[in-house]
Amino acid sequence: MLLLSWSRIATKVVRRPVRFRSYYGLTHIKSLHTQYRLLNRLQENKSGNKNEDNNEDAKLNKEIPTDEEVEAIRKQVEKYIEQTKNNTIPANWKEQKRKIDESIRRLEDAVLKQESNRIQEERKEKEEENGPSKAKSNRTKEQGYFEGNNSRNIPPPPPPPPPKPPLNDPSNPVSKNVNLFQIGLTFFLLSFLLDLLNSLEEQSEITWQDFREKLLAKGYVAKLIVVNKSMVKVMLNDNGKNQADNYGRNFYYFTIGSIDSFEHKLQKAQDELDIDKDFRIPVLYVQEGNWAKAMFQILPTVLMIAGIIWLTRRSAQAAGGSRGGIFGLSRSKAKKFNTETDVKIKFKDVAGCDEAKEEIMEFVSFLKEPSRYEKMGAKIPRGAILSGPPGTGKTLLAKATAGEAGVPFYFVSGSEFVEMFVGVGAARVRDLFKTARENAPSIVFIDEIDAIGKARQKGNFSGANDERENTLNQMLVEMDGFTPADHVVVLAGTNRPDILDKALLRPGRFDRHINIDKPELEGRKAIFAVHLHHLKLAGEIFDLKNRLAALTPGFSGADIANVCNEAALIAARSDEDAVKLNHFEQAIERVIGGVERKSKLLSPEEKKVVAYHEAGHAVCGWYLKYADPLLKVSIIPRGQGALGYAQYLPGDIFLLTEQQLKDRMTMSLGGRVSEELHFPSVTSGASDDFKKVTSMATAMVTELGMSDKIGWVNYQKRDDSDLTKPFSDETGDIIDSEVYRIVQECHDRCTKLLKEKAEDVEKIAQVLLKKEVLTREDMIDLLGKRPFPERNDAFDKYLNDYETEKIRKEEEKNEKRNEPKPSTN
């Protein structure tokens, strides 16, 4: 059989020579390999017949080439295949292939003769053993195919398809979708439905009257079967079955209340119908179990249990547990930082918080060189809490620590310890610190630790926080208990350090409290330098970072990153070649006031009111000594509700005097007072101004001690959710009167100022109606310079006319440098 298959391959190769139109193609190489396998088979067949004594075999062996000749042909084929693969075809390749084909054809003829003789010999032996008729019928299909193959080229039959893997084979894709529970449930439902359908088809309920009049009176009843003392089956006799109304039915049934009542009624009915006692209807009593009905009764319970198991597994997987069950929930979800694949952030990428960065870098130094400190008797700090407003760089510092620590770094969110299952949070804390100890020295960073570190409450009878408190207790024990985590540093980040538990903040757990505030001027310069480095700028980074840092007081690091990104987007939207100063100014306005709502069209009357409103703010800010410098006035709607805005530039001030607060309140009331002076009725546009004024006046009275009647007492509310007041009703009345007095004084002062500067208000309002936007330069042209020196040093240093003109010229120079040169052709 093996030699026969080889002969078919050889015949196919010889009868169908390779098309050399695609000489270097894969088809040609496959054909050569087929011929090469033919040589191997021929040599094996030849070596197997070497020791035979039969004369015909010996004669045939003489016709077959010797081993040396076969080996020579083999080497020719190997050389030919190698040349084809390496694309080194000789010039006489046609002649070379012709010789190889002739050699293969000669070998094929010899093998065909040998195989034919072998089959004839086997046929003779079978004829001698079984007779000619049986031997003739036992001729194999292979022999007939072999004999017919000498005259025509018949392709071999296709190989049988591979067997399909069983359903329980893991390699079978169907098995992956098979769920035993689904199969069982489907089978049960189908069985129940089939049983129910069969019951409905076979049964038909009737009443007692129908049984008596239509069946019993007409003699169609063969017997009665009382099932489970509640139902009676009326079995029909042959006469009843053959009736047209009962065709295809074997029985009817009706229900009974009790057996005694049924027997009494049956006896009475038979007496009334004069049925002879020898022909009375026999009654049988049986107990039957309806498995489908029983299964249907327990089906809701089974489905409920299965649903609970399914939901448990799904929630376990969604919560990060392993697929093995809910026991995987106890594993920590902390992720180990990979310095090769994760975001690569170094300490040089962190700016604006130099003091905090030094503290964190010292932790890294502790872990890298512990002997340097231990030889002095110092112990490595256990942990540090990073606190501060959002966007100041707490998480960024942790990322930089992971990038430069050189030790295993694990980071996890505080909310990942909170689960719906009891004990999961504490188990995850144990697993986290166990992993950290095994890989010590290491660093663990817990972001938003206030999710599990809130202060424990006294008298908590509801039990709502028991699970969170258990997680916190486990955290306290792991950080500084009987098994301290030596050489494991814990860093944590939070925006609310005031609500954390005192036991968590004590030395020995979090030894250092690092507060990261919003950056000052120098910090903003450094942050802008980091972000501007990645942008294509039209000006110099040094000049831009100074001006932008002065324009963004109170901005956090995240706000500055957003400004740089928005400026790049605006430049790309405008098809500019580089990011310019005006793009950054637009981005700052977008971050402060929101996007311009150009589609929000104001009526002429509303636009006029907004213009006078903003003109009142601008004039008050221009002539009040302690007001912040005015940068821009606009009546273009921005954000959700602002119909206009005045942009001021406060400095990095840490102390506010009473006069400064009153000047700010007076400036905030300038819009409403301007409406009162120029229109017969006021509008609702000053609602936000009133909130600011009331808040400042209340703080002056209740917190800052700037009221003579209240004095030096702090009545600040402990919490916004606290419904009680820290003062009496009489004190509350005094506070209200003092707040009103301060606001009224500011209002009277603002009214007096705007009446004196009525021409300036009119002038600014008219220009605003025409241009919609006024800059500081426009204000100087209209009103002259401010009568007071600016109290913001950064304003004078980086926002003066000289610096502005310097940046503009630098941008123009770069534009000319980047312009395409005219063609000389």
Swiss-Prot record:
Organism: Saccharomyces cerevisiae (strain ATCC 204508 / S288c)
Amino acids binding ATP: V350, A351, T392, G393, K394, T395, L396, H531
Biological process terms in GO annotation: mitochondrial protein processing; protein catabolic process; protein maturation; protein-containing complex assembly; signal peptide processing
Keyword entries, A-Z: ATP-binding, Hydrolase, Membrane, Metal-binding, Metalloprotease, Mitochondrion, Mitochondrion inner membrane, Nucleotide-binding, Protease, Transit peptide, Transmembrane, Transmembrane helix, Zinc
TM region positions: 178-194, 294-311
Protein's cellular compartments: Mitochondrion inner membrane
Catalytic center residues: E614
Region (Disordered): 43-67, 115-173, 806-825
Listed GO MF terms: ATP binding; ATP hydrolysis activity; ATP-dependent peptidase activity; membrane protein dislocase activity; metalloendopeptidase activity; metallopeptidase activity; zinc ion binding
Topology relative to the membrane: Multi-pass membrane protein
Name recorded for this polypeptide: Mitochondrial inner membrane m-AAA protease component YTA12
Annotated function: Catalytic component of the m-AAA protease, a protease that plays a key role in proteostasis of inner mitochondrial membrane proteins. YTA12/RCA1 possesses both ATPase and protease activities: the ATPase activity is required to unfold substrates, threading them into the internal proteolytic cavity for hydrolysis into small peptide fragments. The complex is necessary for the assembly of mitochondrial respiratory chain and ATPase complexes.
Ways its activity is controlled: ATP hydrolysis is coordinated within m-AAA protease ring complexes: ATP-binding to YTA12/RCA1 inhibits ATP hydrolysis by the neighboring subunit YTA10/AFG3, leading to coordinated ATP hydrolysis within the AAA ATPase ring.
This protein's encoding gene: YTA12
Effect of G423A: Impaired maturation of CCP1
Outcome reported for the amino acid change (mutating K394A): Slightly impaired respiratory growth. Impaired maturation of CCP1
Gene Ontology annotations for the cellular component aspect, listed alphabetically: cytoplasm; m-AAA complex; mitochondrial inner boundary membrane; mitochondrial inner membrane; mitochondrion
EC annotation from Swiss-Prot or TrEMBL: 3.4.24.-, 3.6.-.-
Subunit structure and binding partners: Component of the 850 kDa m-AAA protease complex, a heterohexamer composed of YTA12/RCA1 and YTA10/AFG3. Associates with the prohibitin complex, composed of PHB1 and PHB2, inhibiting the activity of the m-AAA protease complex.
